Amino acid sequence: MVSRFALLLTLPLAVACAPVAGGGDALSSPAPDAEGALFVAGKFGNTLSKVDLASGEAVKTVDSCANPHELATSPDEKHVALACYGGQTVDIFSTADLSRVASIDLGENARPHGIVWHANGDLYATAEGRKSVFWIRDPLGEAETFEFGSGQEGTHMLAVAPDGLHAWTTNLGSRTVSLIDLKTRRAPQSVEVGEEPEGIWLSDDGDTLWVSARGSNAAFKLDPQTLEVRQRIETGNFPLRITVRPQGDYAVTSNLSDGGLSVIDTATGKVVRNIRVSGPDQAEAKTQLTILFSPNGERIYVAETMANTIAEVDFASGRVLRRLPGTGGGDGLAIIE
C-alpha cells in the first residue's frame, strides 16, 4: 500500500500475452526507432528537461518555476507551456533550446495545474487556488486571459472540446466533475463522480468523457453534455490519470498503488489487460503519476516521480523498453515528433 506521504506528493479480447516488466532496467539506452523529444517537468527540482528519444539522454535542463506540474505543446510543436503549480503563472518555453519566451500571470493564488494547448492555438489551464479555469487567447501574442469559476474545491485537471466552447474539470476536493461553458458564462454544471476524481480525457470526437477516480479504483465513461455516467469500470488501485490512445481504441489508467496500467477497450468499456510497469512492490519507491502516449500510439511514457525516471513501455507487448531520465521529480510530460 502506498503511504500517505507518497500520496500527498501527488496532490499541490482476453489478454493476448501476459504483461511483463522485462527489460527497462537500464537508464537511457538507445532506441533507434524512437524519434522526437520528450519534455519533463521536475516538480521537486523546479526544472524543465528535454530528453532526446533517439539517444535516451537528457540534452538540456533549465530552471523553470515553483513546483511545475503539467505540460502542453503548441500545435506547431515549437513551444511547450508549463503550469506553475507553486505560483500563479503559465510559462512558455521554446522546444528548441528551452529558452523562456513568455510568462502569463493568472493572478494571486492561482496555482495552475492542468493545461491544454488547443488546436485553435489558445491555452486553457485550471487555477486550483482560485477554483477556476483560464482561457488564454493568443498566448504568444497579447495573451488575453478570461477566467471562468468552477465553484469547486481542487479544480485540478481539464479537457477542452474540439470547438473550444466547453471545458470539463475534475475537482478533487469536491469529488466532482464540472462542465464549464467558455462562451456564454452560464453557471457551471457539476456532478459527483466516484471518490477523488482526478484523471480526465475527452475522446477526439467529443462524444465520451473519460474520468478516473483514484479513491474508487475505477474509471467512468460520461456523457459530456449531461455528465450522466454511462459506465463504471473497475481498474487497478489508485488510478490518478487516464488517457486515450491516439487511435481511439483504448483508454489507459495510471495506477499509482499497483505500479501498473489498466488498458480499457473504449468500445466495450472492459479492461482487456493490465501492464506491470514497476509492480506493487516498487510502487511507493517509484510513485507512478503522469502517462502519455507517443503520437503514433506505439509507446506509452510513464512518469516515476520519486525515482526520477520515465518508463518507456511498448504498448503492444506491455514490455518496459527502457527508463529515461526524469530529473528533479519528473511528473508533467509532453512530446514532439
Which residues fall in each region the model found?
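Positively charged n-region of N-terminal signal peptides that target proteins for export
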Residues: 1-5
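Bacterial N-terminal signal peptides
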Residues: 6-16
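Predominantly soluble domains enriched in secretory-pathway, periplasmic, or organellar proteins
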Residues: 17-337
